[in-house]
Amino acid sequence: MNFDMSKLMQQAQKMQEQMKKAQQERENMEVIGESGAGLVTVTMTGKYDVKSVSIDNSLMSEDKEILEDLIAAAVNSAVKKVEENSTASSDIHKMAKDAGIDLPSGINFPFK
Protein backbone atom coordinates (compact mmCIF):
# COMPACT_ATOMS: atom_id res chain seq x y z
CA MET A 1 0.00 0.00 0.00
CA ASN A 2 1.42 3.36 -1.04
CA PHE A 3 0.90 6.03 1.62
CA ASP A 4 1.09 9.65 0.47
CA MET A 5 1.22 11.92 3.52
CA SER A 6 0.91 15.16 1.53
CA LYS A 7 -2.22 13.87 -0.20
CA LEU A 8 -3.69 12.88 3.15
CA MET A 9 -2.94 16.34 4.55
CA GLN A 10 -4.60 18.00 1.54
CA GLN A 11 -7.66 15.81 2.00
CA ALA A 12 -7.82 16.59 5.71
CA GLN A 13 -7.50 20.31 5.00
CA LYS A 14 -10.32 20.13 2.43
CA MET A 15 -12.52 18.30 4.92
CA GLN A 16 -11.71 20.88 7.61
CA GLU A 17 -12.73 23.70 5.23
CA GLN A 18 -16.00 21.92 4.44
CA MET A 19 -16.73 21.42 8.13
CA LYS A 20 -16.01 25.10 8.83
CA LYS A 21 -18.39 26.10 6.03
CA ALA A 22 -21.09 23.78 7.40
CA GLN A 23 -20.64 25.27 10.87
CA GLN A 24 -20.96 28.82 9.51
CA GLU A 25 -24.11 27.83 7.62
CA ARG A 26 -25.59 26.42 10.81
CA GLU A 27 -24.75 29.56 12.77
CA ASN A 28 -26.41 31.72 10.11
CA MET A 29 -29.59 29.67 9.78
CA GLU A 30 -32.88 30.57 11.40
CA VAL A 31 -35.73 28.21 12.15
CA ILE A 32 -39.28 28.80 13.32
CA GLY A 33 -40.80 26.55 15.93
CA GLU A 34 -44.50 26.68 16.56
CA SER A 35 -47.23 25.33 18.77
CA GLY A 36 -50.97 25.67 19.09
CA ALA A 37 -51.42 25.38 15.31
CA GLY A 38 -49.13 28.36 14.78
CA LEU A 39 -50.64 30.59 17.46
CA VAL A 40 -47.25 30.71 19.21
CA THR A 41 -44.05 30.91 17.15
CA VAL A 42 -40.41 31.13 18.17
CA THR A 43 -37.64 32.18 15.80
CA MET A 44 -34.28 30.65 16.76
CA THR A 45 -30.78 30.80 15.28
CA GLY A 46 -28.53 27.82 14.64
CA LYS A 47 -26.68 28.83 17.81
CA TYR A 48 -29.91 28.26 19.78
CA ASP A 49 -30.45 31.98 20.40
CA VAL A 50 -34.13 32.91 20.50
CA LYS A 51 -34.59 35.94 18.27
CA SER A 52 -38.32 36.43 18.68
CA VAL A 53 -41.47 35.05 20.23
CA SER A 54 -44.87 35.75 18.70
CA ILE A 55 -48.14 35.09 20.51
CA ASP A 56 -51.46 35.43 18.74
CA ASN A 57 -53.76 37.95 20.42
CA SER A 58 -56.45 35.31 20.81
CA LEU A 59 -54.27 33.62 23.45
CA MET A 60 -53.91 36.70 25.62
CA SER A 61 -57.11 35.89 27.49
CA GLU A 62 -56.08 32.25 28.04
CA ASP A 63 -54.94 30.73 31.30
CA LYS A 64 -51.31 31.59 32.12
CA GLU A 65 -50.33 27.91 32.36
CA ILE A 66 -51.70 27.16 28.89
CA LEU A 67 -49.71 30.03 27.43
CA GLU A 68 -46.55 28.92 29.23
CA ASP A 69 -46.99 25.38 27.89
CA LEU A 70 -47.47 26.67 24.34
CA ILE A 71 -44.33 28.83 24.57
CA ALA A 72 -42.29 25.90 25.91
CA ALA A 73 -43.60 23.66 23.11
CA ALA A 74 -42.71 26.27 20.47
CA VAL A 75 -39.16 26.60 21.86
CA ASN A 76 -38.77 22.82 21.88
CA SER A 77 -40.03 22.68 18.30
CA ALA A 78 -37.41 25.25 17.25
CA VAL A 79 -34.62 23.35 19.05
CA LYS A 80 -35.63 20.16 17.26
CA LYS A 81 -35.51 21.95 13.90
CA VAL A 82 -32.03 23.35 14.61
CA GLU A 83 -30.83 19.84 15.46
CA GLU A 84 -32.44 18.35 12.35
CA ASN A 85 -30.76 20.97 10.16
CA SER A 86 -27.34 20.68 11.80
CA THR A 87 -24.39 18.88 10.30
CA ALA A 88 -25.02 15.29 11.26
CA SER A 89 -22.57 12.41 11.37
CA SER A 90 -23.69 11.24 7.94
CA ASP A 91 -22.84 14.68 6.52
CA ILE A 92 -19.34 14.39 7.97
CA HIS A 93 -18.95 11.01 6.29
CA LYS A 94 -20.03 12.62 3.01
CA MET A 95 -17.53 15.47 3.46
CA ALA A 96 -14.78 12.95 4.15
CA LYS A 97 -15.70 10.96 1.06
CA ASP A 98 -15.73 14.14 -1.04
CA ALA A 99 -12.24 14.85 0.29
CA GLY A 100 -11.12 11.37 -0.72
CA ILE A 101 -11.10 9.95 2.80
CA ASP A 102 -13.08 6.75 3.33
CA LEU A 103 -14.22 6.60 6.97
CA PRO A 104 -15.58 3.32 8.33
CA SER A 105 -19.38 3.42 8.57
CA GLY A 106 -19.34 2.64 12.29
CA ILE A 107 -17.65 5.91 13.21
CA ASN A 108 -20.07 8.45 14.66
CA PHE A 109 -19.08 11.98 15.54
CA PRO A 110 -20.38 13.55 18.76
CA PHE A 111 -20.51 17.05 17.35
CA LYS A 112 -23.02 18.65 15.06
From Swiss-Prot:
Subunit structure: Homodimer.
Alphabetized GO MF terms: DNA binding
Keywords: Cytoplasm, DNA-binding
Biased composition annotated in UniProt, kind: Basic and acidic residues: 17-27
GO cellular component, one term: cytosol
Family according to the record: Belongs to the YbaB/EbfC family.
Record's subcellular location: Cytoplasm, Nucleoid
Function according to Swiss-Prot or TrEMBL: Binds to DNA and alters its conformation. May be involved in regulation of gene expression, nucleoid organization and DNA protection.
Region (Disordered): 1-27
Name the UniProt record assigns to this protein: Nucleoid-associated protein FTN_1196
Alphabetized InterPro entries for the sequence: YbaB-like_sf, YbaB/EbfC
Main location: cytoplasm
Keyword Cytoplasm annotated: yes
